[in-house]
From Swiss-Prot:
GO molecular function, one term: double-stranded DNA binding
Gene3D superfamilies listed in its UniProt record: Small, acid-soluble spore protein, alpha/beta type-like
Misc note: SASP are degraded in the first minutes of spore germination and provide amino acids for both new protein synthesis and metabolism.
Record's keyword annotation contains Cell division: no
Protein family according to the UniProt entry: Belongs to the alpha/beta-type SASP family.
Keyword DNA-binding: yes
UniProt-annotated site: Cleavage, residues: E28, I29
Function: SASP are bound to spore DNA. They are double-stranded DNA-binding proteins that cause DNA to change to an a-like conformation. They protect the DNA backbone from chemical and enzymatic cleavage and are thus involved in dormant spore's high resistance to UV light.
InterPro entries on file: SASP_alpha/beta-type, SASP_alpha/beta-type_CS, SASP_DNA-binding, SASP_sf_alpha/beta
Record-given protein name: Small, acid-soluble spore protein 1
Keywords of this entry: DNA-binding, Sporulation
BP GO terms, sorted: DNA topological change; sporulation resulting in formation of a cellular spore
PROSITE patterns linked to this entry: SASP_1 (PS00304), SASP_2 (PS00684)
Length: 71
């Protein structure tokens, strides 16, 4: 079922230039986790990197909004 009022993809970046920062974060986290990103890597390994990116971005947003909660 199509959703009304949505005219953009959910993975479209809202801030110009954010793609480079997100990619840098992705590669840094993959290196920390010992994951080689790519088609030959398991979904679980790739997903762990994506999950960590989400955690860190939420933490950054909370700090900027004054929540101060960190993971």
């Amino acid at each position: 079922m199509a959703q009304q009022g949505r005219n953009r993809s959910s993975n479209q970046l809202l801030v110009a230039g954010a793609a480079q920062a997100i990619d840098q974060m992705k590669f840094e986290i993959a290196q920390e986790f010992g994951v080689t990103l790519g088609a030959d890597t398991t979904s679980r390994a790739n997903g762990s990197v994506g999950g960590e990116i989400t955690k860190r971005l939420v933490s950054l947003a909370q700090q900027q909004l004054g929540g101060g909660t960190s993971f």
